[in-house]
């Protein structure tokens, strides 16, 4: 099981009230990993990233997708390793260009898995 699948399982476990659909789409490059639907009736996407450094790698297609879809799109990053201060960080899709350049030095909209989950649950409320 890959690291992003493990991250998905953690996210799903912490958010039983969100309906999750994993998107495995080879015909639309750059499409985020997850489509979520919360109890407020709000759809949103989440790109999952796991990194052992402060850098997050994105394909040009992923960057383009988030630039074209800046609202209700998120990037959830899990930092692995002994120097990881904030293991789980979430960023708005509209910040992807800055996130691609600065990595985890960029200020996240949420820190910690619980806070990230609460943010997604409250969208549209």
Model-derived regions: residue spans:
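Long, intrinsically disordered low-complexity tandem-repeat segments
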Residues: 108-118
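Short, electropositive alpha-helical surface patch
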Residues: 97-107
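Conserved catalytic cores of phosphodiester-cleaving nucleases, focusing on short active-site segments
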Residues: 34-36, 42-52
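Mg2+/Mn2+-dependent nuclease catalytic core
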Residues: 51-70
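Nucleic-acid nuclease catalytic cores
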Residues: 68-97
């Amino acid at each position: 099981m890959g690291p992003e699948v493990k991250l998905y399982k953690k996210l799903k476990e912490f958010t039983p009230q969100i309906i999750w659909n994993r998107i495995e789409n080879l015909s639309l490059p750059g499409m985020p990993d997850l489509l979520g639907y919360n109890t407020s009736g709000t759809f949103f996407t989440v790109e999952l990233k796991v990194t052992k450094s402060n850098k997050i790698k994105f394909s040009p297609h992923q960057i383009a997708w988030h630039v074209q879809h800046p609202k209700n799109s998120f990037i959830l990053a899990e930092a692995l390793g002994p120097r990881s201060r904030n293991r789980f960080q979430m960023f708005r899709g509209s910040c992807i260009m800055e996130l691609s350049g600065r990595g985890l030095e960029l200020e996240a909209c949420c820190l910690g898995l619980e806070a990230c989950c609460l943010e997604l649950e409250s969208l549209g409320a």
